[in-house]
Amino acid sequence: MNFGRVLTAMVTPFTDEGELNYDEAARLADYLATHGSDGLVVCGTTGESPTLTWQEEYELFRVVRDAVAGRAKVIAGTGSNSTREAIEATKKAAQLGLDGSLQVVPYYNKPTQAGLYEHFKAIAQASDLPILLYNIPSRTGASLQPETVAQLAELETVVAIKEASGMMDVASEIRRLTPSRFAIYSGDDSLTLPLLSLGGSGVVSVASHLVGLQLQELIQSYIRGQHDQALAHHLRLFPLFKVLFIETNPVPIKAALEMQGWRVGRARLPLAPLQPSSLQVLRQVLEEMGLLAESKGSEQMATKVS
C-alpha cells in the first residue's frame, strides 16, 4: 500500500455547541483532496480522537470517505490502549472501505516492547487493513524501539510508521533495519526535509491544511534532486511549522482555519482556546505568509451565495 507523500492529519470540525460538524468535515476533506493531500488521517491526535466516541468516529470515517471519493487515501485512527478496542475499531474501518489504519503506541499503561509487538501483531492478524504505526512517546509515555518496528515490518499488513519522536537517530535506525518497501513518515512538519534525506517517504502533516501544495513541492523538489529548492521551501515554511505548535496541537491549527473562514470550532475540553498572545503571534505569521488573503470553507460559500 502506497499512501502517498503528504498525509494530512485532519482536524475534526465541531459546531458552536461542541457537536460534530459533519458538513464542514466533508467540505474540508474535499478541499484537502484537491490541495496537495495524498491521504487524510481521520481521528488521529490532530482529530482529537480521545474526546470522540467510537460512533462519532465511525460516522466521520464514512463522511470523509464519501467526500474524497477516491481522490485521496483515507486512514482511520483506530488505535487504542486496549488491544480489543483497537481490533474492533479497525475491523469497522475495513468494513467501511477505508484504505488504512493509524495505530498509536498504547498510552498510559506503558507496555514493554514485547507487549507492544503482541499488541500490533494481534491487530495485524485480525484485519487485512494496512497499518501505519504511530510512535509519539511525548504523548504516550512509551516508545516503539527500532528493533520492534523491524519485527513488525515483517508482518504483511504493517506497511509504514509515523515517526514522531523527533529524533533523527531513531529514524536512521528504523531505516537501517527495515526493508525499502516499509515507508517512514515524519510526524513533524519541520522534520520532513531531514527525514527525506534518511530515506523517508513523506509527512503526516498539520500544516498541509494551509500549505498542502507547497509541502508537495518541497518533497517533489527533493525527489527530483533539486535540494537547494527543497531547502528554500523548507525555510520559507518553517515559521508556520513552528507557530502551529505554539500551544498544544490541534488548538493552533483550528484557530488558523477559523481565521481562514472554516467553521471547525474550538477543540473539545480539556483543550482550551489559544491564549490571546499566542493568537496574535499566529495571526501575524499567517498574514506574513499571505494565508489570510481569501476566505475558505463555509464563509467562502456564504460570500458566494450573497
Curated annotation (Swiss-Prot):
| Subunit note | Homotetramer; dimer of dimers.
What gene codes for this chain?
A: dapA
On whether Transmembrane is a keyword of this UniProt record, the answer is no
Compartment annotation: Cytoplasm
Q: Which reaction does it catalyse?
A: L-aspartate 4-semialdehyde + pyruvate = (2S,4S)-4-hydroxy-2,3,4,5-tetrahydrodipicolinate + H2O + H(+)
For this chain, one GO molecular function annotation is: 4-hydroxy-tetrahydrodipicolinate synthase activity
Major site of localization recorded for this protein: cytoplasm
Identify the HAMAP family for this entry: DapA
Q: Main role?
A: Catalyzes the condensation of (S)-aspartate-beta-semialdehyde [(S)-ASA] and pyruvate to 4-hydroxy-tetrahydrodipicolinate (HTPA).
GO BP, sorted A to Z: diaminopimelate biosynthetic process; lysine biosynthetic process via diaminopimelate
Pathway, per UniProt? Amino-acid biosynthesis; L-lysine biosynthesis via DAP pathway; (S)-tetrahydrodipicolinate from L-aspartate: step 3/4
**EC class of the enzyme, as a word:** lyase
The protein's name is 4-hydroxy-tetrahydrodipicolinate synthase
Marked site (Part of a proton relay during catalysis) residue numbers? T45, Y108
Q: What is the lineage of its organism?
A: Bacteria, Bacillati, Cyanobacteriota, Cyanophyceae, Synechococcales
Q: Which organism is it from?
A: Synechococcus sp. (strain JA-2-3B'a(2-13))
